[in-house]
Structures are given as C-alpha cells and as structure tokens.
C-alpha cells in the first residue's frame, strides 16, 4: 500500500462532474482511520459506473450479497436518483471463535443528480449476480423545423 494518498481515489474525475453527489474524503487512502469511519466499509463505498448512450443514462452498481428486495431505488427532489440498501452484521454465537472478519456490513446510500433530459417517470432496473443495472431513458432531442425560403430576383 502506498503511503502517498490518491486524491481522486481512482475515480473518473467525478470531482469535476456536476451531476455527482459523492462526498470527497481527502483521508480515504491514508493508512489510519478516517474521521468518517462509516466510509471505510467496502459495502458503504459501493462503486457505481454511469454511462450515457444515445438513448439512456445507464448506472451499474456492484452490490454483492444483497437480494433485489433489500435494495431500494428512488427518485427524490424530481431529478435525484438514490440507490440504498443495508447489509446487517451476522448474528454472533458466543461459542464461536472468529479468526477473521472481512465482509462488510452497513448502509449503502448513493445519489446522482440526473440531467434535464432524463425521463424520470420511465426508470427501469434489474439485478443479476450482485450487479444492479438502472436505466434512465432520455428525452428525444427535437430538431427545429427547417423551412426553405425562396430567394426572389
């Protein structure tokens, strides 16, 4: 592990993306606990890819270990897509001896401000093999009518 922090966390310049609502943690990659200890959980910091095609905005989130019934999708404030879920800590048996606990638990909340061309009333989602895919169709760009004008003379 490098002692020099990666200030952009390997993300694709989301610091410059006006639609991303991620909270930047400058201490995320340092070898000591962050002040935002909940952000240290791999589950809480679920990575989401967002691509735009000519027809839609497509989000893909890795959410292993959750069933589709445990994931909640909402459109808030008219244009904010919120993906949330929760993975609970496994119940502990007093007779068991744990040697390693690496699987993360906690709450997941990710929000993305959708652009004006998003059809928020037609959002579709599917989940397969721990990957959530959310498709937000786009409004068709209406080209202005072009009218030919005769030139006299």
From Swiss-Prot:
GO molecular function, one example?
Answer: unfolded protein binding
Instruction: Write down the CDD domains for this protein, in alphabetical order.
Output: ACD_ScHsp26_like
Q: Which Pfam families match?
A: HSP20 (PF00011)
Q: Name the GO cellular-component terms.
A: cytoplasm
Q: Which GO terms describe its biological process?
A: protein complex oligomerization; protein folding; response to heat; response to hydrogen peroxide; response to salt stress
Q: From which domain of life does this come?
A: Eukaryota
The compartments listed are: Cytoplasm
Q: Where is the sHSP domain?
A: 39-153
PANTHER family, sorted: HEAT-SHOCK PROTEIN 20 FAMILY MEMBER
Subunit composition? Forms oligomeric structures.
**What name does the UniProt record give this protein?**
17.3 kDa class I heat shock protein
Source organism of this protein record: Glycine max (Soybean)
């Amino acid at each position: 592990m490098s002692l020099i922090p990666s200030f952009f966390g390997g993300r694709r310049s989301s610091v410059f993306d006006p639609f991303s609502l991620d909270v930047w943690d400058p201490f995320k990659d340092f070898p000591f606990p962050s002040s935002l200890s909940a952000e240290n959980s791999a589950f809480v910091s679920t990575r989401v890819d967002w691509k735009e095609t000519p027809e839609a905005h497509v989000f893909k989130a890795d959410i292993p270990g959750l069933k589709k019934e445990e994931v909640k999708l909402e459109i808030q404030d008219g244009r904010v897509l919120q993906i949330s879920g929760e993975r609970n800590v496994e119940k502990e048996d007093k007779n068991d001896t744990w040697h390693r606990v690496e699987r993360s638990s906690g709450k997941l909340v990710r929000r993305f401000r959708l652009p004006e061309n998003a059809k928020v009333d037609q959002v579709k989602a599917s989940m397969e093999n721990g990957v959530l895919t959310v498709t937000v169709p786009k409004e068709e760009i209406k080209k202005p009518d072009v009218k030919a004008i005769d030139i006299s003379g």
